């Protein structure tokens, strides 16, 4: 699991801080990330988490720390996997972009061109772009039981029959769960092998660059998944919302494919995947996933000027499945993109800096993921300043 770090041993410092179970490695000059990351545990902002950074195609920070669960008897280590809620959407967006790159999918094409059954009850003119940029008019879907979320065919049948709550394309409203089934079914339909979205991601993305990301976790990996901790948010959630969150700690949920919300991974893998969208990584010549033109198209703003997202009631700039972060993280230059998830996980890339960052954790918080976030804000602020001054290699 540490082979990538060992490749850079000549310029990487190994870290062992047993008081907070902090382990990992970082390149020379990046030690400040270790120090700030450690403060998350000293100040009890984190229970267990991992953080990783790629710069110029190489892994420069790879750290894990804290505890696997609230019993604090097992370390959170480099074998730990974590459910990341909506950060999962970014991998679905990458899968769709790969299909566009291969000529299998066109963002401007009607969904019915690939999925004829979708064209009913006012959805006939929905485009692929409408689905990927949260404009399809299906931000939510009534289900009689969460068990229905576990059955792909059931969810697709329901979505095919559903009537949109606005004219597709005319407005934007975050599709918290439905995005994954809609986009995932498109990928399955155009894939010559008809793989599920989880299979496609594993075989075309994560296996290719030797990382771990699962939508549909193999049962044998369940013991590696750190349970999410909701102590900090229980008082601000109603009973039904809290039930949804706890549902994501169940093994049956981990093993299903809920692409918008149940991706399971670690920070190292996320940072590597996003780095590989911009360049080859880890000295592997064939590791770049997207051509520059496809990446640019996928990360071009598809939100109208001054548009308010119907779901969030605030502006929410998005491209083709990616959140756009130029306003949230201005220190990393234009065209920064990625996705965050409920509770605090995040991955993003900054093409102007050839930089990618990922953070995942088990202790959930609703603090906004901006430069003022207490867990990652100081790390990102300092990193951005030092990159601007060319003080980091």
Question: Where do the model's predicted regions map?
Answer:
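Catalytic loop of the DD-peptidase/beta-lactamase superfamily, centered on the K-T-G motif
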Residues: 16-67, 79-80, 171, 188-393
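A structural signal for well-ordered alpha-helical segments within the folded catalytic domains
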Residues: 31, 90-94, 109, 126-129, ...
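Active-site-proximal loop and beta-strand segments within enzyme catalytic domains
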Residues: 70-177, 185, 189
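Intrinsically disordered, low-complexity regions enriched in Ser/Pro/Gly/Gln/His and often acidic
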Residues: 1-2, 23, 145, 174
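Solvent-exposed loop/turn segments at secondary-structure junctions
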Residues: 138, 180, 363-365
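Cleavable N-terminal signal peptides of Sec/SRP-targeted secreted and luminal proteins
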Residues: 2-17
């Amino acid at each position: 699991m540490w082979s990538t770090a060992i490749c850079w041993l000549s310029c990487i410092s190994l870290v062992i801080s047993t008081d907070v179970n902090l382990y990992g490695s970082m390149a020379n000059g990046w030690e400040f990330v270790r120090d700030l990351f450690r403060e998350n545990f000293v100040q009890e902002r984190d229970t267990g988490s991992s953080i990783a950074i790629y710069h110029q195609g190489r892994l420069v920070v790879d750290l894990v720390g804290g505890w696997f669960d609230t019993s604090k008897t097992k370390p959170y280590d480099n074998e730990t996997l974590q459910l990341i809620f909506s950060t999962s959407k970014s991998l679905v967006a990458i899968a769709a972009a790969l299909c566009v790159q291969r000529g299998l999918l066109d963002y401007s094409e009607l969904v019915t061109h690939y999925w004829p059954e979708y064209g009913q009850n006012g959805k006939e003119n929905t485009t692929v772009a409408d689905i990927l940029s949260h404009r399809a008019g299906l931000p939510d879907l009534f289900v009689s039981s969460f068990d229905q979320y576990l059955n792909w065919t059931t969810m697709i049948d329901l979505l095919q029959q559903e009537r949109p709550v606005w004219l597709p394309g005319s407005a934007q409203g975050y599709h918290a769960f439905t995005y994954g089934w809609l986009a995932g079914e498109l990928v399955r339909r155009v894939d010559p092998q008809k793989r599920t979205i989880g299979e496609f991601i594993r075989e075309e993305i994560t296996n290719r660059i030797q990382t771990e990301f699962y939508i549909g976790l193999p049962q044998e990996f369940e013991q590696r998944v750190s349970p999410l901790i909701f102590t900090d948010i229980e008082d601000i959630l109603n009973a039904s919302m809290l039930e949804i969150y706890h549902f994501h700690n169940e093994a049956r949920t981990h093993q299903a494919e809920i692409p918008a919300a149940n991706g399971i991974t670690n920070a190292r893998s996320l940072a590597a995947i996003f780095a590989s969208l911009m360049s080859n990584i880890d000295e592997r010549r064939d590791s770049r996933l997207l051509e520059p033109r496809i990446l640019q198209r996928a990360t071009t703003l598809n939100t109208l000027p001054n548009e308010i997202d119907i779901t969030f009631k605030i502006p929410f700039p998005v491209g083709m499945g990616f959140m756009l972060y130029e306003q949230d993280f201005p220190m990393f230059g234009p065209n920064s993109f990625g996705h965050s998830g409920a509770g605090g996980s995040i991955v993003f890339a900054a093409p102007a800096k050839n930089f990618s960052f990922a953070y995942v954790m088990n202790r959930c918080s609703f603090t906004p993921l901006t430069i003022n976030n207490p867990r990652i804000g100081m790390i990102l602020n300092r990193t951005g300043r030092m990159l601007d001054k060319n003080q980091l290699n």
